[in-house]
């Protein structure tokens, strides 16, 4: 008898056992499919609730398609027949004025490099130049700024989400007016203009890819070449527009404090100087920034640095502007007291200067300095007031401010512009300010029906999740799953039939159309279908008593306390902005409590797992636990187990603290937060050195955890010591090349000047292997076990299966490694160090949960949930728009390419949530041999732990819904509470998708069946 025969005989079973197994596995496969369908229905219910709430809360203003005409606004002769408009993206105001080198905030890289504008203004003796501070209205994303600059209207928060999906602006705007007047508008630069205005632009325009922030020169060089070719030689244009992106892209890629910013600003300054000399006397030159940038180079929020940009008007004709007193243009202290105008004021100003009607939806006010005398100024004001009053009358706007507006309008009509121009101007400006405030308040109206529907549906889904995944025993849910699915399908059909029948017979409610009615009917059908099945077996009293029993033990109460504390953070803006610190504190608290448990309370016997085991032994196998293992759960921890548990607790505490040192700060945190996650540190050699060490340390750490259960066998060495180490090495090469690009000392080396092609190739190789090849290998690869024959006599059957006690967990974690290496590619070096710490924290939590017999306790999923939120913050993110790392989207392609750009940004932003959503199954599978739990019981417990993680994220999402609604009139609602609710919604969606389709549908079902096929258990 050879060794192969011995192995086969050890794993063989009788025919009766095989028949029983086949019946069991067939039932398992059937229930597995039903579980997936049930979770999909619950996910649909939650997605519908999020959709309703988002519809009701995220505002969108009503836009009229009216177009202004010269008959509606007073006809004024044009002062200029041609205009050159140059938009310099992210031209912060202090970039364009002289800054004293002794100033505390002076920086060589971004100050005193663009002096053409101020020099022209300061040396101007004949009033041909005008330089102003230009204040943007948040959000400061480029698309929203272009809308404001061309229509004169205010953006809403929901517009920020369309920055990458611009569609043609149908409302009246400055470019449409030029088009209607048969003016030729030529354009070069940011292709966002083509997305928004292509019907109004010349076919000779030259749009360029705008979203690739890694490319600093292509757009700028294209604009400069286009202007050199067309500005003087080509006479067939009336307005020429250029939009340069280099300064903005340098900010996104490196931050403002980088030598490349100085180079780019000098290039822009030279180009401006050339334009000043090249335009003719009849051309108006407008140079402006659409927004600024913060200290990290980002924008999108409403900090001062993000809102303050630059506006420069110039003509070679003298006496074009009527300047105010010199004190209004004080550049001291970075221009803190310098005169400013709002961006919405530009539209009416340009329209009046070019002799065009003011766009219909404009809410701005002409810039004071554009009028050369009082008479002309009163004419401008008269045109502006006529347009505003026409807009108000057409919109039929009524508000509490009418008692102010109506007397003002009457006084204006009774005050002829020619007789008392000063009074007329004052009345007109006051009218505009009050009307603008009125529109801002009116556009802040919420759809309370949709908000209430969203909150109600999400709260109901929370109750369903808790009932199905925790209150009802998993072994009973196994029996009920085949009843849930048909019940839900039938009720969804019935409710849709009823809803649409009612809508057909009776008038449809005003707050819900046919599409939203279908969604609501579907949600109600899912709820009714679930509750019919539940209450067919149980009642409210039993469920309430079961809830009390579940929360009776120590660790469950700790878990609930953590959830409540986290959910209550959203009750205050002060708590919300410090969420990163609070989450780290809660995770450290869990580590301290487990350390106390191992050191001082080794004989604790009151965990839910022990009680379940006891019940299983006394009452049979109701919970699915093998009775032979029940007594082992009663045994106190051995000395070695206590030492091991103490070690893992210490690792969790220390690594949580180390991870919290990687910070990206919110503006509201002020001086109390020192950012460490920045471009300088991510490109530093010490961080790259740590990443190099991680190539060897991370595989060694994972190997150590595997050796605890003798699981470092077969597939494990290949995955951990070859694949993981190899990908980490390639990853290190990629980010080292990126660091070289940031280093002025080495960038001059010829062969290092352009490594873009090599980086793209390397990134695609890593992504292809980690996203596709490694997962195919996992599906087809061997288990992490080895048959060890003790006796040299091959006729002896004495053998040990190494890795048997952790056969599920060791194999499943290889899939986690696949996902980890996928995520690491799309994260910057400091974030990769955070993931190294996270991996060790994750494995320590799994060991702690196993040692304390807490596999069925809710503390496990909650601890993993806290881990995901901590590392969301430590990988360079906050719940704000500016913290989204858009530049990562261009690691695989030079332009926005579906789906590669989206995959990169999702893996970068939600990597920790994806890892935890996949790893939550390990709470059940880690150190779980095949002979303890039946396949169905094992799957039921995995679903239970996944359900608790979903419950945690649902509670956070529900809390954010409630409190963002409560604070809807709060000063910080759009800056703090609204972004947090969006992040909570997206986190829940990502968790639902990964848990349902990744953890349950793909990984767990396949692994359980595969292992049971081998061992016939």
UniProtKB/Swiss-Prot annotation:
GO terms for cellular component: endoplasmic reticulum; endoplasmic reticulum membrane. Its main location: endoplasmic reticulum. Its EC number is 2.-.-.-. The chain crosses the membrane at residues 34-54, 347-367, 457-477, 484-504, 515-535, 558-578, 582-602, 644-664, 685-705, 715-735, 765-785, 806-826, 829-849, 903-923, 947-967, 981-1001. It is a multi-pass membrane protein. Keywords: Cell wall biogenesis/degradation, Endoplasmic reticulum, Glycoprotein, GPI-anchor biosynthesis, Membrane, Transferase, Transmembrane, Transmembrane helix. Glycosylated. It is found in: Endoplasmic reticulum membrane. GO terms for molecular function: mannose-ethanolamine phosphotransferase activity; transferase activity, transferring phosphorus-containing groups. Pfam families: Phosphodiest (PF01663). It is an enzyme of class 2 (transferase). Changing residue 887 to G: In MCP1-4; impairs growth at 36 degrees Celsius. InterPro entries: Alkaline_phosphatase_core_sf, Phosphodiest/P_Trfase, PIG-O_N, PIGO/GPI13. Glycans are attached at residues 66, 71, 100, 182, 203, 411, 681-682, 707, 742. Pathway: Glycolipid biosynthesis; glycosylphosphatidylinositol-anchor biosynthesis. One of its GO terms (biological process) is GPI anchor biosynthetic process. Belongs to the PIGG/PIGN/PIGO family. PIGO subfamily. Involved in glycosylphosphatidylinositol-anchor biosynthesis. Transfers ethanolamine phosphate to the GPI third mannose which links the GPI-anchor to the C-terminus of the proteins by an amide bond. Involved in cell wall biosynthesis. Present with 300 molecules/cell in log phase SD medium. PANTHER family: GPI ETHANOLAMINE PHOSPHATE TRANSFERASE 3 (PTHR23071:SF1), PHOSPHATIDYLINOSITOL GLYCAN (PTHR23071). This is GPI ethanolamine phosphate transferase 3. It comes from Saccharomyces cerevisiae (strain ATCC 204508 / S288c) (Baker's yeast). The gene is GPI13.
């Amino acid at each position: 008898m050879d060794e192969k025969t011995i192995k086969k005989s050890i794993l063989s079973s009788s025919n009766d056992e095989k028949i029983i197994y086949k019946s069991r596995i067939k039932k398992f496969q059937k229930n597995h499919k039903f579980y997936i369908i049930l979770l999909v229905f619950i996910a649909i219910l939650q997605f519908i609730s999020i959709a309703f709430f988002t519809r009701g809360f995220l505002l969108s203003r009503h836009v009229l398609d009216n177009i202004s005409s010269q008959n509606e606004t007073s006809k004024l002769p044009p002062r200029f027949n041609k205009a050159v408009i140059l938009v310099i993206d992210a031209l912060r105001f202090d970039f364009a004025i002289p800054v004293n080198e002794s100033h505390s905030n002076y920086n060589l890289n971004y100050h005193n490099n663009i002096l053409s504008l101020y020099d022209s203004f300061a040396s101007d003796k004949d009033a041909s130049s005008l330089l102003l501070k230009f204040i943007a209205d948040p959000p400061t994303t480029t698309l929203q700024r272009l809308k404001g600059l061309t229509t004169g209207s205010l953006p809403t928060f929901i517009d920020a989400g369309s920055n990458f999906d611009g569609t043609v602006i149908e409302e009246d705007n400055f470019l449409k007016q030029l088009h209607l007047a048969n003016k030729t508008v030529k354009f070069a630069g940011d292709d966002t203009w083509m997305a928004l205005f292509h019907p109004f632009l010349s076919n000779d325009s030259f749009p360029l890819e705008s979203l690739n922030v890694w490319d600093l020169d292509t757009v700028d060089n294209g604009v400069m070449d286009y202007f050199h070719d067309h500005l003087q030689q080509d006479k067939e244009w009336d307005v020429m527009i250029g939009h340069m992106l280099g300064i903005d892209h340098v900010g996104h890629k490196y931050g403002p404090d980088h030598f490349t910013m100085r180079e780019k600003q000098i290039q822009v300054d030279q180009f401006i100087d050339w334009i000043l000399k090249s335009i003719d006397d009849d051309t108006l030159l407008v140079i402006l920034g659409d927004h600024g940038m913060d200290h990290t180079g980002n924008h999108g929020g409403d900090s001062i640095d993000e809102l303050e940009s630059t506006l420069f008007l110039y003509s070679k004709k003298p006496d074009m502007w009527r300047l105010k007193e010199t004190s209004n243009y004080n550049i001291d202290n970075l221009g803190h007291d310098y005169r400013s105008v709002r961006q919405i004021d530009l539209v009416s100003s340009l329209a009046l200067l070019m002799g065009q009607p003011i766009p219909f939806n404009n809410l701005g006010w002409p810039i004071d300095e554009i009028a050369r005398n009082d008479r002309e100024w009163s004419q401008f004001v008269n045109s502006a007031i006529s347009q505003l009053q026409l807009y108000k009358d057409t919109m039929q706007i009524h508000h509490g401010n009418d008692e102010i507006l109506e007397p003002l309008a009457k006084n204006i009509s009774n005050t002829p512009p020619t007789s008392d121009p000063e009074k007329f101007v004052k009345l007109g400006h006051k009218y505009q300010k009050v009307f603008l405030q009125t529109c801002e308040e009116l556009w802040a109206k919420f759809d309370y029906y949709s908000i209430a529907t969203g909150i109600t549906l999400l709260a109901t889904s929370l109750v369903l999740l808790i009932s199905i995944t925790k209150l009802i025993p998993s072994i009973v849910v196994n029996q009920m799953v085949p009843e849930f699915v048909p019940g839900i399908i039938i009720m969804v059909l019935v409710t849709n039939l009823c809803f649409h029948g009612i809508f057909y017979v009776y008038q449809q409610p005003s707050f819900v159309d046919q599409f939203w009615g279908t969604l609501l009917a579907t949600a109600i059908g899912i709820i009714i279908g679930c509750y019919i099945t539940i209450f067919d077996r149980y009642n409210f009293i039993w469920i309430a008593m079961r809830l009390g029993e579940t929360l009776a033990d120590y660790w469950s109460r700790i878990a609930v306390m953590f959830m409540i504390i986290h959910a209550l953070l959203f009750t205050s803006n002060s708590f919300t902005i410090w969420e990163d610190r609070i989450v780290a504190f809660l995770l450290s608290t869990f580590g301290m409590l487990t350390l106390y448990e191992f050191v001082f309370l080794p004989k604790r016997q009151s965990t839910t797992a022990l009680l379940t085991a006891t019940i299983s032994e006394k009452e049979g196998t109701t919970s699915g636990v093998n009775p032979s293992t029940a007594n082992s759960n009663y045994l106190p921890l051995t000395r070695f187990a206590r030492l091991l548990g103490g070690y893992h607790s210490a690792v969790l505490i220390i690594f949580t603290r180390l991870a919290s040192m990687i910070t990206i700060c919110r503006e509201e945190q002020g001086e109390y937060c020192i950012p460490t996650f920045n471009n300088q540190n991510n490109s530093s050699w010490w961080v790259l050195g740590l990443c190099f060490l991680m190539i060897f340390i991370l595989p060694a750490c994972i190997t150590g955890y595997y050796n605890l259960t003798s699981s470092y066998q077969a597939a494990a060495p290949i995955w951990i010591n070859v694949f993981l180490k190899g990908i980490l090495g390639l990853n290190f090469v990629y980010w080292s090349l990126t660091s070289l690009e940031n280093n002025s000392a080495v960038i001059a080396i010829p062969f290092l000047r352009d490594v873009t092609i090599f980086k793209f190739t390397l990134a695609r190789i890593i992504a292809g292997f980690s996203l596709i090849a490694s997962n195919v290998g996992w599906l087809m690869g061997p288990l992490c076990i080895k048959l060890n024959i003790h006796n040299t006599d091959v006729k002896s059957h004495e053998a040990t299966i190494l890795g048997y006690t952790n056969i599920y967990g060791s194999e499943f974690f290889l899939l986690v490694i696949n996902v980890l290496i996928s995520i690491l590619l799309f994260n910057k070096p400091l974030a990769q160090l955070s993931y190294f710490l996270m991996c060790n924290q994750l494995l320590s939590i799994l060991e702690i949960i196993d040692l304390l017999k807490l596999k069925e306790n809710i503390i496990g999923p909650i601890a993993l949930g806290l881990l995901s939120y901590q590392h969301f913050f430590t990988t360079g993110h906050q719940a704000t728009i500016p913290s989204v790392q858009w530049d990562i989207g261009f690691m695989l392609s030079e332009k926005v390419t579906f789906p590669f750009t989206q995959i990169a940004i999702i893996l970068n932003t939600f990597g920790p949530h994806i890892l935890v959503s996949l790893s939550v199954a390990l709470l059940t599978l880690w150190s779980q041999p095949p002979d303890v739990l039946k396949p169905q019981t094992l799957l039921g417990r995995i679903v239970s732990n996944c359900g608790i993680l979903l419950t945690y994220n649902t509670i956070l999402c529900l809390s954010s819904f409630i409190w963002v609604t409560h604070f809807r009139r709060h000063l910080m609602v759009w800056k703090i509470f609204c972004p947090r609710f969006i992040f909570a919604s997206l986190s829940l969606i990502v968790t639902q998708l990964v848990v349902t389709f990744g953890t349950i549908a793909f990984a767990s079902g396949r692994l359980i069946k595969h292992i049971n096929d081998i061992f016939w258990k």
